[in-house]
Amino acid sequence: VRFAQIFTLLLTMYLAPLSLRAQSENDMVNFLQAGPSDASKLMNAYLNPVIEGLSYGFNGGWYTTAKAHKTLGFDIGVSFNAVFIPSSNNYFDPNSLGLETITDFTSTAANGLAPTIVGPEDETIYYVDLNGDNQTDANFDGPQGLDFKEQIKISGVLAPTAQIGIGIYKNTDLKIRWMPE
C-alpha cells in the first residue's frame, strides 16, 4: 500500500505540469515573431531550467546488482529521479542573450526579468525591430511561467526511466535505459 501511495504521488508530480504545458507551448510560438536567431535564444533561456533538471535526473538512478548476471540473466527496473530547481532559475535576463531584433522588453516581475517555464506567472512584452531602423515594428507577449512552486508545491522535475540489465558474456552486463521524449 505504501508503494502505491508513493508511486501515485510521484506520477501526479510528473503529470501535473504536463497539463499546463499546452498553454506554455502556444505562448512559446510567439517567440518566432523575433526571427529564428532570437527565437532560439529566447526559447532556450525559457526552457533551460527544465532541460537542465531533466539532464541531471536522467543521469541519476543508475543501479546494478553487485554480481554480474549469468549469460542471458536479466533484471528490469523503473525509477523516478526528482531534481529540485533552485529559485534562481525562475527568471532570465533577455538583455544578456545577445538578441538582434528584440530592442526592449517590459515585465510585470518585481525584478524586471522574464520568467522561465518554472517561474511565476509574470507577463513579459517584447518589442521587435525587424528591419534594423531602430523603430519598433512589432511587439508580442512572451510566455508566462507555469509557477511550479505554486502549482505542484515543489520547484522541481521528475525524470522517469526504465532500465534493463542483461548478462552477455563472462561476467559482463549490458545496461539499456529508456527515457521518455
Show where each model-derived region lies.
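Transmembrane beta-barrel domains of Gram-negative outer membranes and organellar outer membranes
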Residues: 24-181
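Bacterial Sec-dependent N-terminal signal peptides
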Residues: 1-25
